[in-house]
Amino acid sequence: MELIEDCIKENKTCIVLVPEISLTPQTISRFSKRFGSRIALLHSALSDGERYDEWRRINRGEVDIVIGARSALFAPLKNLGLIVIDEQHSESYKQDDSNPRYDAINMAIKRVELNKGAKVILGSATPTLDAYARALKNIYHLLNLPIRVNKKPLPEVTLVDMNQEFKRSEGHFSLLLLNKIKEKLSKEEQV
């Protein structure tokens, strides 16, 4: 939110992508409390009239922030400063069920390349392997959040060599995972 605030102070605009349309009401509510009414909403569930009205507000410069699903990436914002992609790991950012097919993350990266000085933030507690590998190669800048929002400890992570597991057992799960699942179920906990 602070980076968005900084962008607006510099008279730049922002796009915030969420993976699902169902997440837009709570996102709009949160942003409206902080940034007021200069926010537009774009997604495929809007009526043609609603979509037209939002595009017109954006085109007139009445909007600083566009929030929506992947199609919001095409908003005609002027002076773009930042694109935030929440839950970057979500498959919802890939449009592959109809033409034109595109990956919203790749499109966002291309859009900021065309808008000199603009930035992309890929937010995720569980980034894709591709994004994580790019961060390790310093193509992306990785920011670790060592503390969860709710102050709960981070989960313990165990790497299992599945090549070895496939030699030992049949099936698609490691013995360690199967044992942990059995342990949780025996305590009537969710898995």
Predicted regions and their residues:
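Conserved motor-coupling elements within RecA-like helicase/translocase cores
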Residues: 29-66, 74-80
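SF2 helicase catalytic motif II
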Residues: 57-122
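Post-Walker A helix-loop "phosphate-sensing" segment adjacent to the P-loop in P-loop NTPases
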Residues: 7-14, 36-38, 140-142
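Switch/connector loops and helix/strand junctions flanking conserved nucleotide-binding motifs
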Residues: 24-26, 49-52, 75-76, 91-94, ...
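Flexible beta-alpha connector loops of hexameric P-loop NTPases
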Residues: 39-48, 90-102, 163-171
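Conserved interdomain linker/interface between the two RecA-like ATPase lobes of SF2 helicase motors
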Residues: 105, 110-191
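Motif I (Walker A/P-loop) of helicase-class P-loop NTPases
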Residues: 1-5, 108
